Design a protein with these regions (language model features):
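Flexible "stalk/tail and boundary" regions
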Residues: 1-10, 14-15, 23-81, 85-86, ...
Length: 138
């Protein structure tokens, strides 16, 4: 897999839908899974990547109550989505509320998944990391 890379800006429409960038659509011909991400964004995973993530959650759930709680919250808030012929996907209201997705949305590749961010939260949480990355770690 080449992975998901690139950064795009789109908007959530009045029906809670967002257009998936063309370069990402082929990976989601069979649909995808939207999940809450611990950083405050929403992740879009392919069916195969979602299965891998579920297996990780299941293993964590077997070993601790914290793992069970994390798996429980993750599974309860995951939504299966379809991409329509116009390249749009509906984001369930609980995930839009979780990530504050209204109006403009930043969509970017994160190698094994796609992330959807509120642009203000992206600036607050990720922009400082971009500066660190560009400076190097020395």
């Amino acid at each position: 897999m080449a992975g998901f890379v690139g950064r795009f800006e789109h908007s959530v429409d009045s029906k809670g839908r967002v257009i998936l960038p063309v370069r990402f659509r082929e990976a989601f011909l069979r649909g995808g899974f939207l999940t809450p991400n611990q950083e405050g964004c929403v992740a879009l995973r392919t069916p195969g990547e979602n299965e891998r993530q579920m297996a990780e959650m299941l293993e964590a759930a077997k070993s601790s109550s914290a793992g069970r709680n994390q798996a429980r919250v993750w599974a309860a808030n995951t939504a299966e989505v379809e991409i329509d012929k116009q390249g749009r996907m509906a984001i369930p209201s609980h995930l839009r509320d979780f990530a504050h997705l209204e109006g403009d949305v930043l969509i970017h590749g994160a190698i094994d998944r796609i992330e959807l961010w509120n642009p203000s939260q992206w600036e607050e949480r990720v922009k400082p990391m971009e500066a660190w990355f560009l400076e190097g770690d020395e």
